[in-house]
Amino acid sequence: GADAVRGEKVEGKLDISTPKQTYAKDELVEVLVKGTGLRFVNALSFALAYDPADYEFVGIQPLGMKNMENLTNDRLHTNGTKSLYPTFVNIGEHESLEGESNLFVIKLKAKRKVSFKLTATDGYLVDKLLNVHTF
């Protein structure tokens, strides 16, 4: 990271969106994760809490993640809720994420008729010097 030596710090935010709001049982819900104003992003993560009666996690489709490793975790909490933790990290020296782009798609299957109201929380962007920017 020569970039980080100049005192540059990680910036930006991630937003999630779906093509529509209502999904029928067994329909695939594609949640687009878009980055805006990204600077020096070497790792990213956020939480997406969901009700396992509503959704089943199918997978992640990387779009603009360069050489980042997908370390996403789908976790069942003791209170019965589930949270998906989409997480991508550069292992070793790889190009950081910059600018504005569609980063990846989270694929969920609707287990019954649902209105998509999930929100990303606890978002973190990290640079090569481990500076953290929350969103």
Give a label for each model feature.
Residues 1-135:
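Acidic, low-complexity intrinsically disordered segments
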